[in-house]
C-alpha cells in the first residue's frame, strides 16, 4: 500500500513540476521588444490635414526584470488621465493591479492562479474596491502552454457577461476570436499571407469592419487600412482609414525610436466590395492627404 501511495505522490509531483513553468506571455514578447527594456516613453503627435497639431499623447511604461509591466501612465495634452500599477508575488505572477484615474476613481484588483486539469494556467482578477461604489466583478483568463491567452470569462455581480476564446495557428499567431455566447456567429477572423523575407500581410474581419495590415520582417507595421461595411444586405463599402508608416528609425537593439504616419485615400472610393478598394491600395491608385501623426519612443535598458 505504501508503495502505491509513494508512486501516486511521485506522479502528483511530476505533474506539478510539468506545468509550474507556465507563465503568461511577457509584454516584451507581445510588443516585440528587443533586449531587456526597463522603461519606454512613447510620445505621439496627431495632426490635422492643415498640418496643425491636433493632440499630443504620452505613455510611459515601466517593466520589471521578467518583462512584465510594473507601472504605466497615460497623458494627453499634458494632462495625466490614467495610472496602472502592478504588484507581483514571489513566483513572478501578478498579485495586485491598481488603476487610478486622478481625481475620479481608484480601482483595486486582486489576482490568483491555478492550473486546469489539462495543465493550462488559469488567472483570476477580482475587483476588490472602487472609489465610486463597489459591485462584484471578476475576469478569468486561461493561458495555453506557450503563455498565450486562449479564453476570457467576464463576470459582473455573479453573472457571466462575456466568454471569448482565441485560437492560434502553428506559428502562434491568432486566427480566430470566438464569442462563445453566440458560437454560430464569427466574432473575429484573421488571415495571414506570410512572405519569404519574414514579413506578412494580415487581414482581420469582424464587427462590420475589415482591416489590412502589412508587417515587415522586423515586426514593424508599414501599412494599415480600415474598410467599413454599412448594412447587412448589399452593404455599402467605404474606406475609413489608410495609413503608411514611413521614415522609421531604430536604436542599437533594433527597437523603433521614431516613425511618421501619412494618410491616403483611394482615387475611386465608390467600389462595391472591399477587395476592389484593397486592389486600388495595392496598385497604389491613391492620393496623399498628408502627415497624420508622428511617434517618438525612448528606451531605458536593464543591460
PLM feature spans:
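Sec-dependent signal peptide recognition
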Residues: 3-10
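Hydrophobic h-region of N-terminal signal peptides that target proteins for export
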Residues: 11-19
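Buried hydrophobic residues that stabilize the cores of well-folded domains
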Residues: 20-303
Amino acid at each position: 500500500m505504501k508503495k502505491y501511495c509513494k508512486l501516486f505522490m511521485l506522479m502528483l509531483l511530476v505533474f506539478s513540476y510539468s506545468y509550474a513553468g507556465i507563465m503568461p506571455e511577457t509584454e516584451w514578447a507581445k510588443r516585440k521588444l528587443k533586449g531587456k527594456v526597463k522603461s519606454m516613453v512613447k510620445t505621439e503627435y496627431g495632426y490635422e490635414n492643415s498640418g496643425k497639431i491636433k493632440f499630443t499623447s504620452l505613455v510611459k511604461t515601466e517593466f520589471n526584470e521578467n518583462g512584465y509591466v510594473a507601472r504605466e501612465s497615460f497623458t494627453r495634452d499634458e494632462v495625466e488621465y490614467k495610472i496602472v500599477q502592478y504588484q507581483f508575488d514571489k513566483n513572478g505572477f501578478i498579485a495586485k493591479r491598481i488603476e487610478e484615474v486622478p481625481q475620479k476613481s481608484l480601482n483595486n484588483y486582486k489576482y490568483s492562479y491555478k492550473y486546469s486539469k489539462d495543465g493550462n494556467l488559469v488567472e483570476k482578477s477580482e475587483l476588490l474596491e472602487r472609489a465610486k461604489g463597489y459591485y462584484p466583478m471578476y475576469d478569468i483568463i486561461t493561458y495555453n502552454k506557450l503563455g498565450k491567452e486562449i479564453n476570457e470569462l467576464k463576470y459582473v455581480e455573479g453573472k457571466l457577461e462575456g466568454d471569448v476564446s482565441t485560437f492560434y495557428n502553428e506559428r502562434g499567431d491568432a486566427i480566430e476570436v470566438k464569442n462563445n455566447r453566440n458560437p454560430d456567429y464569427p466574432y473575429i477572423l484573421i488571415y495571414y499571407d506570410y512572405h519569404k523575407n519574414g514579413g506578412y500581410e494580415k487581414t482581420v474581419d469582424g464587427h462590420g469592419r475589415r482591416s489590412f495590415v502589412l508587417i515587415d520582417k522586423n515586426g514593424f507595421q508599414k501599412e494599415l487600412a480600415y474598410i467599413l461595411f454599412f448594412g447587412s444586405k448589399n452593404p455599402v463599402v467605404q474606406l475609413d482609414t489608410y495609413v503608411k508608416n514611413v521614415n522609421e528609425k531604430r536604436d542599437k537593439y533594433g527597437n523603433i525610436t521614431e516613425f511618421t504616419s501619412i494618410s491616403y485615400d483611394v482615387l475611386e472610393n465608390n467600389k462595391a466590395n472591399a477587395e476592389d478598394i484593397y486592389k486600388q491600395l495595392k496598385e497604389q491608385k491613391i492620393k496623399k492627404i498628408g502627415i497624420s501623426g508622428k511617434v517618438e519612443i525612448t528606451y531605458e535598458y536593464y543591460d
